[in-house]
Amino acid sequence: MANRTVKEAKNVHGTNPQYLIEKIIRSRIYDSKYWKEQCFALTAELLVDKAMELRFVGGVYGGNIKPTQFLCLTLKMLQIQPEKDIVVEFIKNEEFKYVRALGAFYLRLTGAALDCYKYLEPLYIDNRKLRRQNRAGQFEIVYMDEYIDELLRNDRVCDIILPRIQKRSILEENNEIEPKVSVLDEDLDDELPSDEEKADETNRPKENSTAVRRPRRVRSKSRSRSRERERRSGQGNSARSRDYYDELEDYDRQRNRVRNRDTHNEDYDRRQNNGRHDRERERQDRDSIRERERDGDRDRRDRERERERDRGRHDQRERDSRGERDRRRY
């Protein structure tokens, strides 16, 4: 009874919401200790408190397929089917990043393509780190924007097969969604000169050609800005899309540089820790070898003493038996 979907729940993608998770994983969740103890009789209000306690994301791990707490709460949300406003508040929550990750994962499972692009794409500006548990049970670092990109592009996330959604380009061609605008557009608008500044430059009296001559680099920069203005004003959605992808490449390169620096620092710390662990392990090995040698010497001494006692008892019995024979003879 506790594992049934609520009566007022609606079908999602033509099926029971809980069936969006494969049966084998669903059965493992029902049998898990966290589901039985922490997810029993949860409501939408109480589920918020449980989501705030999350410390990592992930699917299943281990040889016997153990579900993570993140996956248990996802199934609970599919079971009680909270209102869309609650899910949107999960996604807009900036204080608890794992609450946002849980809401984004649930919306990707149950939401339409338009809702997924509408509510998940703004999260590309979130560069916070998330801990994710892999199938081996080990933790790895993933960034929030990378996690959101996986939800929108990959077929499987956190060991769950995601429903298919329409590509963004198709929705743009059908005018169902506005072309994506990069967050860098505002910076580009600030760098471009306004019409008034352009008019002032035009009306300014000409001076000596050698004095007003600017470097070639500056002219090319102004010329590129002019071409950019003309392209932005004269072209349609396709041009804006191309601009966005160019800016996205620049953003990815900058993000990769930051990540490479973080990875280098983490590798350095890991090498330092490994060196300390190796020295500690060598010291423990030396101590264990000395302990085994002391134990071996102690055992040898005990065996020698035992043999001496046995030899003494044997000699005593021989003397006693010889004396007894002598008494019988006389």
Curated annotation (Swiss-Prot):
Q: What is this protein called?
A: Pre-mRNA-splicing factor 38
Q: Which residues form a coiled coil?
A: none
Q: Which gene encodes it?
A: Prp38
Q: What is the lineage of its organism?
A: Eukaryota, Metazoa, Ecdysozoa, Arthropoda, Hexapoda
Q: Where is the composition biased (Basic residues)?
A: 213-224
Q: What does this protein do?
A: Required for pre-mRNA splicing.
Q: Which UniProt keywords apply?
A: mRNA processing, mRNA splicing, Nucleus, Spliceosome
Note down the stretches annotated as region Disordered: 182-330
- GO CC annotation terms, alphabetical: catalytic step 2 spliceosome; precatalytic spliceosome; protein-containing complex
Assembly information from the UniProt record: Component of the spliceosome C complex. Interacts with Mfap1 (via C-terminus).
- The family this protein is said to belong to: Belongs to the PRP38 family.
Q: Where in the cell is it found?
A: Nucleus
